[in-house]
Amino acid sequence: SDAHAHEQQNAQRIITAGGSLTEIVFALELGDQVVATDSTSMYPEKARHITKLGYFRQLSTEGVLAQQPTLLLGASATGPSDMIEQVSGAGVDVVIYDMPKNLQGLRQLIEHVGEKLQVSDKAQHLATTISARASREVEAFKKQKAAYSPVDNRPMKALFVVSNNDRGLTVAGHNTVPQAMFDLLGIQNGAESLEGYKLINNEAVLQHNPDVIFVAGHMLHGKEALSHLCRHPAIAATFAGKHCLVKAMDSNVALGLSPRFAQGMSAISEHALQALALKAVNETATPARDKAE
């Protein structure tokens, strides 16, 4: 058929560098044109089984060219720069995307990729669907929050931890996807004054006293990891620490521009409401019991 011939002609050999781009190409139903990805591209399931070329910041020219790609789509940190020069010098179309880490940025990314792959209508539809889901998450969260505490409209407080080592906790601040999700839901981020991903000192965490803490799933190893984090010196004395309201989130959803953005909001909303339910119970507890503690 004509349509089939047209498709054959337009078929690309695509390399995606960055989990978000891989996910978007699959969401646009062009996953069968992806010949290789970087090592962070583990979703959807089919993407796991595609040739992996290593970490997207450190791709090798040989590795990329060996796949005979026609197109390389890369997240902003894709590199090194000499690889990009050599690959485009070899005649591969290279497009590097740098988008703001928020819902608007995700929509733009989807639309740009859709345009590049000649599926603009599909991309427009996907972007609109994601926005609509995000709006529904916001409505549902606000409604449920109001039901718990009709009088108390103080924002919930949260923190998103991306790594934990001897130097302290590294958290998601301004211009990150967690911040964008918190903003939409009206949740206050304890690291909002920091730019990007930064170390936060223990006092700042205690002072903010988060109701709930989220952590990037990739940093958790073993069953004890979450309870271990609840006992962290910065966290133990906070509301979230005392009640061990520390929840893991899929790193690709929570840190990247994923088409699963609304599902990420849903996970944040669900855990924030658990914390709210617990607070409601605690605050209605009798003063006598409080004294006994």
Residue ranges, per PLM feature:
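Flexible loop/hinge segments that line or gate small-molecule binding clefts
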Residues: 43, 84-112, 116, 246
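Short secondary-structure boundary segments
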Residues: 18, 76-77, 99, 194-197, ...
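His/Asp/Glu-enriched short active-site or ligand-binding loop at hydrolase and phosphoryl-transfer sites
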Residues: 38, 174-197, 217, 247-248
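Structured C-terminal subdomain patch of bacterial secreted/periplasmic proteins
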Residues: 12-13, 105-115, 124, 135, ...
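Short helices/loops that flank or line small-molecule/ion binding pockets
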Residues: 61-68, 90, 201-209
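Basic- and aromatic-lined ligand-binding clefts that recognize polyanionic substrates
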Residues: 12-25, 122-185, 254, 281-293
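A short, structured surface patch at a secondary-structure boundary
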Residues: 13-67, 71-77, 81, 190
